[in-house]
Design a protein with these regions (language model features):
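Nucleotide and nucleotide-moiety/phosphate-recognizing core
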Residues: 2-160, 165-184, 192
Length: 199
């Protein structure tokens, strides 16, 4: 398995309440493994690895649990938390692979596809789905965007898309993604919506 070239860190945001799901989404088993473990396995090549979640809620070997700086404020706040933690350990700057906990089809190969686009001058790398929309919850962000994330949150903005609109973004076209990862953006919002073909 190809390793992600350094310096790349990883974070999974798992601080949500799972209200629509009806149970703890991160621990729901798909293909015999909890969603949290499936997403984490796709990011094994990255370091450091951070789980954005309440302290003590989950046990994920090899991952540091970092509590949300703004609990209950959504994934943009989770991204801020991860970037803030990175800034404390690596102020020189690096890339962060940021993933939601409900994407069971993420793979190391998908992340490698994104890292290949992380060139100089870029602030984020994201893929496009079949409708041409960006997918901010399975994307790369440069640690230098922390101030922009915090400014959005301070101003009451919670949408991940609002961040991408303000960044220099490299986009991976859907045709390239679909050729090897056609189900990568299928997420699990409610139990009846479990994607088929997960093994």
């Amino acid at each position: 398995m190809p390793s992600a070239p350094p310096p790349y860190a990883a974070a999974i945001t798992a601080g949500g309440q799972s209200r629509r799901f009806g149970q703890d989404k991160a621990l729901y088993r798909v293909g015999g493994a909890p969603l949290l473990y499936r997403v984490a396995a796709s990011l094994d090549a990255f370091a450091p690895r951070m789980l954005i979640a309440p302290a003590g809620k989950y046990r994920l070997p090899g991952w540091q649990t970092v509590p949300d700086l703004r609990p209950g404020e959504g994934p943009l706040a989770g991204l801020e938390t991860a970037l803030d933690a990175l800034d404390r350990t690596d102020p020189a700057g690096c890339w962060l692979a940021f993933a939601a906990v409900d994407l069971p089809h993420l793979t190391p190969g998908f992340w490698t596809m994104l890292t290949c686009r992380a060139g100089a001058g870029m602030q984020a790398v994201t893929g496009l789905d079949a409708t041409g929309r960006t997918q901010p919850l399975a994307s790369l962000y440069h640690s230098s965007v922390l101030a922009q994330v915090s400014a959005l949150l301070d101003g009451g903005e919670r949408r991940m898309a609002a961040l991408l609109e303000r960044l220099v973004v490299a986009q991976v076209p859907w045709q390239q993604i679909a050729s090897s990862h056609p189900e990568v953006y299928l997420n699990l919002n409610t139990i009846p919506e479990q994607p088929s073909g997960v093994d």
